[in-house]
Each structure stands twice: as C-alpha cells, then as structure tokens.
Amino acid sequence: MKMWKQLYLIVWLAFLQIITILIPRLGSSLVDLHATLGFVILGLAHYDHVMLNRTQAPNRLKRIAKSTAVLATFQIILGIILYANLRLGVSIPLVEVVTFIHLVIALAIITQAASVATAFDMWEEHEYTPSK
C-alpha cells in the first residue's frame, strides 16, 4: 500500500472508532469493535512512524507521527481501564475524567493523523509552493 494511503487509513479508522462508540442501541458488541479498532490504530500509528522515518519526509512530519504513536499508546491504557469498567464491572474512581481524557486524546490522534497524511501527500507530490 502506498504510504499516503496508509497514513489516511488511520484517519478513517479513528473516525470509525469514534462513530462506533456513539451508537448506543447496538450495545456491547460495539464496545468490543471499538476496542479492536483501538489496537489496530495503535499498531498502525507505530508502523506509520517507523515507515515515515525511512523516508526523506520533513522531520516535522516524523515528529508528529511519533507523538501520534505515543498518544495511541496512552490511549490504549485508558481504553483498557474503561473496558474493565464497562465490560468487566471493575469499579474505577473518576471514570468520567478518564472518559473525557480518552475522548480528547482520540480527537488529538485523528487531528494529528490527518495533518501528517495531508502534509506527506503534498510533500510526496511536490505540491508545496513558495509564498509570495
């Protein structure tokens, strides 16, 4: 798969992951799908970071991809805590705070992933033009 397609894939998977958790009527099976997508996004974020480091892409893109991978790692930790609360019945203090942080990080991941995907695509196609 071309690098730009792979970078956009994480954006759409993150979007799908956010959407799955917002559909309450479909129940707990969507929580499992949400969790599975989280692990896929984690793997892709780290893979994208490694693959970007092998290119001549600007260092800024590499740094953003690295921070996205770090956020995805932290996101999984929060996700496991929330999963234990929702599916396993483990009582978690301040679960609302954890949920809010989980949401904020999800939005940061999708934003950063979109930024990297667009910038890499433009860099690869030499679409940058000097300002006048």
What spans do the regions from the language model cover?
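Polytopic transmembrane helical bundles with strong interfacial aromatic enrichment
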Residues: 1-132
